[in-house]
Amino acid sequence: MFSTAEGSVRRCFFLGIVLAFVFIMYPIKKNMKLKPNHILIYDVVLLVVAVGVYFYQIIFKEELIAMGRRIGTPQIIIGIIAILVLVEACRRVVGIPIIIVAAAFVAYTLLPMGADKPLQGTIYNLVYTTNGIIGTPIQVCSTYIFLFVLFGSFLEATGIAAFFIDCANSIAGAATGGPAKVAVISSALCGMVSGSSVGNTVTTGAVTIPLMKRTGYPPEFAGAVEAAASTGGQIMPPIMGSAAFLMAEMTDTEYADILVRAILPAALYFTGIFLMVHFKAKSIGLKGLDKDSLPKGKDIFPKLYLLLPLIVLVFMVIQSGTFTMAYSAVVACLVAIVAGMASRETGSKKVVMLLAAIPLLVYSRGEG
């Protein structure tokens, strides 16, 4: 990622790298089992082709601009390959249905409805302009979402998820139906960092679901509570799902405004789940956890420094007239790295986090 790079260059670079990781991480068949650190030859070929076709647009950017819509046969072939590798990547990650929908819309553009060369125009618009593949969603991903996901990863590496679960246990663990309430509160707290329903479920569910089952909740209810609570991570400020960033970009609204307006819906969502859990626990006579087994304030207080990166991020995002979103995320990442250096949870990850700080410092100089 280059903070000073032109928009289309940044988008192509980002997409090429993302596709490379897709072909490394997702096998051609979902159930295919591969040896650790083993990549099949055709995945390597697809990786190289994917990087090549999108980096081609970076290297020959000026020539492509000069051609405009009058692209030649080589550019059409490269464009078709760019579409096909993207389709294959989507198939591996999302599945067939989205491919069918996309193919239907692309096929519609190829209908001869007055255009002399519909294929040439379609390839040009889809591949070589910011109205197609490298449009607004990729722009938002490469500029904002990537950095906010990186921030969440750094923060999770510091052990903040365990800190949030300890806080939730301390607050509600001893209450009626304590474990389920802990699941709701910890999911809300972790949702502030992850912005992901799946990530939230994996992080908190590994602790809260077994805890709920041990205290008498039916297994299906325990799973449902965690799934419902973790879904709220998508709408829990300050880091919400990707849709929030797209909303800000497409409506030309400051992310800070969306962040503030999301507080009430998120609060109502988690309050509703919390009350449902409370009444369910009352109806089946479930009690809370033993107070002696719960974290004490003296155990939680020394870890309050883990909240500093989150506080810095919220402060800078609210000051949207002073700091850009990207700059706010980068600074928050750097603060998270500093917090990680002080945390025992990071362990061997400290070296990786320090190495990651170098490009982030370079990026911040460009954004600042």
Describe each model-derived feature in a short phrase.
Residues 56-60, 201, 214, 234-247, ...:
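Transmembrane-helix bundle segments that line or gate the permeation/cavity pathway
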Residues 1-66, 76-80:
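Conserved, well-structured core domains of diverse proteins
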Residues 165-233, 243-246, 252:
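Hydrophobic transmembrane alpha-helices that form the pore/transport pathway of multi-pass ion
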Residues 73-77, 131-144, 170-184, 215-221, ...:
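Membrane-interfacial loop-to-helix junctions in multi-pass transporters
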Residues 8-16, 139-149, 256-272, 324-333:
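Alpha-helical transmembrane segments
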Residues 53, 151-157, 186-200, 228-235, ...:
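Helix-loop-helix module between adjacent transmembrane segments
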Residues 5, 34-38, 64-150, 167, ...:
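Hydrophobic transmembrane alpha-helices of multi-pass solute/ion transporters
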Residues 260-366:
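Long, contiguous bundles of hydrophobic transmembrane helices that form the permeation core
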